[in-house]
């Protein structure tokens, strides 16, 4: 997950999917920030060679020997984008400043010092609890206990629910409940 300007990465975090919902293949319900210099270097080469400016999410998958392979590059906001905020990476603010500066060459805002991202874990609580149940139904009860532990752990942040602005989180949870009833 990164923001770049003129072929140089301004800020980057690497995240790893821990659980997904639906468990048969869906978006992340739990992810964590990880330190992967090899993936950062790979992304930097592509960003530099293309002169890319903007947001991007590089998705890699490791083969059986642990070698990463690039699956896709999403030049847009992605589902786990809230992790950029949870980790304190500064990516949302930097992206906004770069967008402002692109259209205001005469009055650019200087980029602030880039913070070092914190190694954090994030869940989408409702879908992660349902993922835990789904994994348990598939014979992996440890994932249910992991989801419950993350739900109860105050250090693990929710990607949508914030006490200062509860409506987006409530709308998301409502949509999950109605989807579960239908299907």
Residue ranges and their predicted role:
Residues 66-75:
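Short glycine/threonine-rich loop-to-helix capping motif typified by GTGT followed
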Residues 1-51, 74-96:
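ATP-dependent carboxylate/phosphate-activation module, predominantly the ATP-grasp catalytic core
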Residues 1, 15, 61, 123-124:
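Residues in well-ordered beta-strands of folded domains
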Residues 3-9, 63-66, 100-101:
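Short acidic-glycine loop/turn motifs at beta-strand connectors
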Residues 20, 64, 85, 101-103:
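Alpha-helix termini
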Residues 53-65:
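A short glycine-rich, hydrophobically flanked beta-strand micro-motif that places a catalytic Asp/Glu
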Residues 97-183:
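Peripheral (often C-terminal) accessory segments that flank ATP-dependent C-N-forming ligase machineries
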